[in-house]
Amino acid sequence: MNKFTNLLIKRTASSLKGGDFRELFRKNYIPITQFEKVLLSVTSCVEGLKNPTDSNSVACITELTSNRALRKLQILMNSTPDGRRIIKNRPLIDSSKYSIKDLMAFPDDSLGRRYGEFLTTYNLEIDRAPVRYVNSEDLAYVLTRFRQVSLNDYK
C-alpha cells in the first residue's frame, strides 16, 4: 500500500481477541468523510489490482462498499431463531476463546471442526482483521461474523 493509504488506514495492533464486540467496535472504528471514503476506495482498488494477493486492499474495499449487502445479510440473519440469537449475543470465533486444536476436537460434522480443518488446510490463523470503516456497530458485527465463518463454507 502507498503512503496515503497507510495514513488513512491507521493500522491498529488490536485484533478480535478478548472483550465484547461493542468494546472492539469502539476501539477499531475509524470515522472517515465521504471524500476520504471515495479516495480510499479508489486507492485500495488500484493497490488491489497491482497486488491481487493483498488482503488488506480487499478487506478495505469490502468495508467501504458493502453497506447494502451487509443490511441484507443482517435481515437474513434476523429471519431465523439461530441468526437472531447470534445477532443478540454477538459471539466471536477468535484465539481468545479457541485454538485450532480446540476446533479440531469438535465432532466431524460441526462448524468448529470444519473451520479447524479449513484453517489447517490453508495454514491460516483464527483471528481476522478488525472492521474499521463500517459506521454501524450492528453491521460491523455482521461483517466480522462473515469474515470469521464464511470462508467458502470450509470445503
UniProtKB/Swiss-Prot annotation:
Its main location: mitochondrion. Its cofactor is Zn(2+). Pathway: Cofactor biosynthesis; ubiquinone biosynthesis. GO terms for biological process: ubiquinone biosynthetic process. It is found in: Mitochondrion inner membrane. InterPro entries: Coq4. Pfam families: Coq4. Belongs to the COQ4 family. Component of a multi-subunit COQ enzyme complex. This is Ubiquinone biosynthesis protein COQ4 homolog, mitochondrial. It comes from Cryptosporidium hominis.
